[in-house]
Amino acid sequence: MVFLKKVAVIIGSDSDLPVVQGAFDKLAFFGVPYEAHIISAHRSPAAAENFSKNAAANGFGVIIAAAGKAAHLAGVLAAYTTLPVIGLPIKSSTMDGLDSLLSVVQMPKGVPVATVAINGSDNAGILAAQILAVSDEDLAGRLLDFKRSMAEKVDEADKKLQETMKN
């Protein structure tokens, strides 16, 4: 299946790559095309600006921006595009990632960034798919099946618990 739009997964450093694997896995699971790039808001700001300004023209529909510490990548990318930007704060050695979370979530009016949990790459991938599903019924159906499957697993766990409680 070919989608009109793809997801850009931008990471601030190659050390963030293991954390974003969950986003890659979820995007692949739902059949959403994606590309990954390493761009630093602080070390390569011109590249961040260039990527963001041209993302829509290059076929992207959503940007996931993953960074730790002074995690300004999502905000910098959001400043130069009208595409939805999902900030993925990465746990750092300082404050267990709280510094990253606050850097991503505290955006000024007019420059919104959707934010997932610290190291919440699975949810970043799912949220990106949900955004694209607004204009793709097949993708929306796959997401609905995924959510139904999660509900079924909860129901099964509850049934097992109820059986255990009877004994």
Model-predicted regions and their roles:
Residues 16-20, 44-48, 67-76, 95-98, ...:
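Short glycine/serine/threonine-rich phosphate/pyrophosphate-binding segments
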Residues 36-57:
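N-terminal beta-loop-helix "entrance" segment that forms/cooperates
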Residues 5-43:
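Glycine-rich phosphate/diphosphate-binding loop of Rossmann-like nucleotide-binding domains
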Residues 24, 49-52, 79, 96-108:
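Active-site-proximal loop->helix
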Residues 51-89:
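Glycine-rich phosphate-binding loop
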